[in-house]
Amino acid sequence: MKIQLVAVGTKMPKWVEEGYKEYSRRFPKDMPLELVEITAGKRGKNADIARILQKEGEAMLAAVPKGNRIVTLDIPGKRWDTEQLAEQLEAWKLDARDVSILIGGPEGLAPACKAAADQSWSLSPLTLPHPLVRVVMAESLYRAWSITANHPYHRE
């Protein structure tokens, strides 16, 4: 199973790139973590945010391979602790589909992305900076994998 993070935003700070790479490289070959960056729409004083969200959503969904399970990151989504995320990872493996996790931009996700989702996950009730979410996602998914693989990374 491949896990794909589809995230709005490019040109992240170096610490984000390094943090993401640190965890993504740890994944086993049979469960690679891939990042697909979607160019954010231009935001300005008179920007049409609905139109920007629509365009970003279209680009995100176009980046998802046909047949993938789509999981959106959204504050009203289901909250999973680390063990529950590990259980989700196991369930996703049994589903025999690759997984695409959609991370929206500053205004969140387009309605089309939410409508296409098989699941919605709330990473936190807090509003987190989107660059930080990439690093947190990579670490959280790696930790969940380590639980399923009985790897010593996760300690209770």
Curated annotation (Swiss-Prot):
Protein name as it appears in the record: Ribosomal RNA large subunit methyltransferase H
Molecular function as annotated in GO: rRNA (pseudouridine-N3-)-methyltransferase activity
Record family assignment: Belongs to the RNA methyltransferase RlmH family.
Record localization: Cytoplasm
Pfam families named among the record's database cross-references: SPOUT_MTase (PF02590)
Catalysed reactions listed for this entry: pseudouridine(1915) in 23S rRNA + S-adenosyl-L-methionine = N(3)-methylpseudouridine(1915) in 23S rRNA + S-adenosyl-L-homocysteine + H(+)
UniProt entry keywords in alphabetical sequence: Cytoplasm, Methyltransferase, rRNA processing, S-adenosyl-L-methionine, Transferase
E.C. no: 2.1.1.177
One GO CC term on file: cytoplasm
Keyword rRNA processing: yes
Binding sites annotated in the UniProt record for S-adenosyl-L-methionine: L73, G104, L123, S124, P125, L126, T127, L128
Its job: Specifically methylates the pseudouridine at position 1915 (m3Psi1915) in 23S rRNA.
Species for this entry: Aliivibrio fischeri (strain ATCC 700601 / ES114)
Subunit relationships: Homodimer.
